[in-house]
């Protein structure tokens, strides 16, 4: 069975971590002093547990794929800045009263989301529904031979030096999305949205707006996750889930 591509940045590190990266704790302490005891995250402990593929989920071979909803995306799906009980996929699971599999991979783009979608389609039992929360339409993955076997892709955003605008990633990613829509058409409930306003506009999908912020002050907070989960659930139910 071909394995899905997860968050390679966490592979090779402990599977359980208290911070997203090496700078997160310092940033949190600064935010704690500034925002004070009324801040939701002031005394809230968060642990990030990852499976052997780098997903914030149980091991792939233990999942009941055929009776689950699968959510694919970037760090907003994986729940950076939030405790597992507060992230959108956990809340969606509570609303739908069925398993929800989190295939969020931090920092990744539409290309990897579509690769995982294809691997899901070809290798795993067909789920009850698929949700694509599209990342920035400008991001892309680049294969690297300099990294070890578990970290073969690096991900580029427009503000980073290696970014190659000549490849016209907006148009490429639009084609990835079109292919993914065709892949799942008429097979199951399929819902698309994005937290990125430009992506939502270009792809003509729902824009899941940011209402509050997580502990890292960069991602959705608890209220945003609740709103996202409710929107996803409503749209899946409209499709017969």
Specify the residue positions occupied by each region the protein language model found.
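Surface-exposed cleft-lining segments at the edges of enzyme active sites
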Residues: 75-80, 105, 158-175, 214-217
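Short, amphipathic alpha-helical "lid/cap" segments that border enzyme active or binding sites
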Residues: 110, 114-117, 222-233, 237
């Amino acid at each position: 069975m071909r394995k899905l591509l997860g968050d390679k940045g966490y592979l090779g590190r402990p599977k359980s971590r208290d911070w997203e990266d090496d700078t997160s704790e310092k940033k949190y302490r600064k935010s704690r002093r500034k925002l004070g005891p009324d801040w939701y995250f002031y005394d809230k402990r968060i642990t990030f547990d990852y499976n052997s593929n780098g997903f914030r989920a149980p091991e792939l071979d233990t999942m009941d794929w055929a009776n689950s909803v699968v959510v694919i995306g970037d760090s907003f799906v994986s729940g950076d800045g939030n405790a597992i009980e507060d992230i959108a996929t956990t809340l969606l699971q509570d609303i739908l009263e069925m398993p929800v599999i989190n295939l969020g991979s931090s920092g990744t783009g539409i290309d990897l989301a579509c690769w995982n979608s294809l691997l899901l389609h070809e290798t795993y039992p067909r789920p009850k529904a698929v949700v694509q929360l599209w990342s920035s339409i400008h991001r892309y993955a680049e294969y690297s031979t300099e990294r070890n076997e578990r970290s073969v892709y690096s991900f580029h955003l427009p503000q980073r030096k290696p970014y190659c605008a000549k490849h016209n990633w907006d148009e490429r990613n639009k084609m990835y999305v079109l292919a993914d829509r065709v892949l799942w058409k008429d097979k199951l409930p399929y819902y698309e949205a994005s937290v990125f306003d430009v992506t939502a506009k270009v792809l003509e999908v729902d824009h899941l707006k940011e209402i509050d912020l997580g502990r890292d002050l960069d991602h959705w907070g608890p209220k945003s996750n609740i709103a996202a989960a409710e929107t996803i659930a409503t749209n899946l139910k409209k499709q017969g889930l």
